[in-house]
A protein has these predicted regions:
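Short linear sequence motif anchored by a di-proline
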Residues: 1-214
C-alpha cells in the first residue's frame, strides 16, 4: 500500500517531453496524505491539481473509505476497465514512504538514487468535493521489488523513464503487458524521523534534516 509520499519540489522537475503546457501552482509537500492535492499528468488531457483518493460509496449510499491504491492485477476487472482505457494518469513524486515495526512505527523513504522524480502510475475520476469539481486519483501498486519487500508486500508502480509516455498514451490498449517498473538499481532507501508519522507534520527538517527542502 502507498498512502504517504513526498511531492515534487518544483514544477521544472517534470520532463518537457511529457508536459510542456502551462505551469501549475502548488506547494512542496514532504508528507502527502490522503485527501491532499498534488500535480498529476492526465492521459489525453494535460495536467491538473488532483486529490489523493477516489471517493466511493457502499451499496446503501453511505460513504466508504477513499480508494488510495489499485492493484495492477485487478485492473482488468469490470470496475476498472474504463479507467484503464480512458482514465490513466501519472503522479510525479520525489519518493514514497513505508513503515516497519521497530519498537514502534519506523518510517522509511524510497527514492531514486540520483534525485530524479518517480513517476507513479495511477487512475483517476472526476467528482464533486465540497462543491468543487476536481480530479481525484489512486496510485497503482504491484508486487514489491527486492528493496521494498522487507517493508511491505506491495509497492507503487514507479514507471521506468521510457514507459511513462506509453502509460499516458490512451492509444496503447495493453500497457500492463509490458515491463513498466523502474529498475531495482535506481532505488535507494533510508530511515526517516518518526515525526513524519503525524500526517500534519509538513516541516521536512523535522523528520529528514539531511534533505534539501524546496
Amino acid at each position: 500500500m502507498c498512502n504517504r509520499f513526498r511531492s515534487l519540489e518544483e514544477w521544472s522537475q517534470i520532463p518537457r517531453d511529457l508536459y510542456s503546457g502551462p505551469r501549475l501552482n502548488f506547494e512542496f509537500n514532504p508528507n502527502v496524505a490522503p485527501t491532499e492535492t498534488v500535480p498529476a499528468l492526465i492521459a489525453g488531457d494535460g495536467a491538473a491539481i488532483a486529490r489523493f483518493g477516489i471517493n466511493r460509496l457502499f451499496p446503501n449510499g453511505k460513504p466508504r473509505p477513499p480508494l488510495l491504491n489499485a492493484r495492477t492485477d485487478g485492473l482488468r476487472k469490470g470496475q476498472f476497465r474504463t479507467h484503464m482505457s480512458k482514465r490513466r494518469c501519472v503522479i510525479p513524486a520525489a519518493g514514497f514512504y513505508e513503515w516497519r515495526e521497530e519498537g514502534g512505527k519506523q518510517p522509511y523513504y524510497f527514492a531514486r538514487k540520483e534525485g530524479k522524480p518517480l513517476m507513479l502510475a495511477g487512475i483517476w475520476e472526476e467528482a464533486e468535493y465540497k462543491g468543487d469539481r476536481r480530479i481525484a486519483f489512486a496510485i497503482l501498486t504491484e508486487e514489491p521489488n527486492e528493496l521494498v519487500a522487507p517493508y511491505h508486500d506491495r509497492m507503487p508502480l514507479a514507471l521506468a523513464d521510457d514507459k511513462v509516455a506509453l502509460w499516458l498514451d490512451l492509444g496503447e490498449e495493453a500497457p500492463l503487458e509490458q515491463k513498466l517498473l523502474l529498475d531495482l538499481a535506481e532505488f535507494a532507501v533510508r530511515p526517516m524521523g518518526r515525526a513524519m508519522n503525524n500526517v500534519r507534520e509538513k516541516n521536512l527538517a523535522a523528520f529528514d534534516p539531511d534533505a534539501k527542502a524546496a
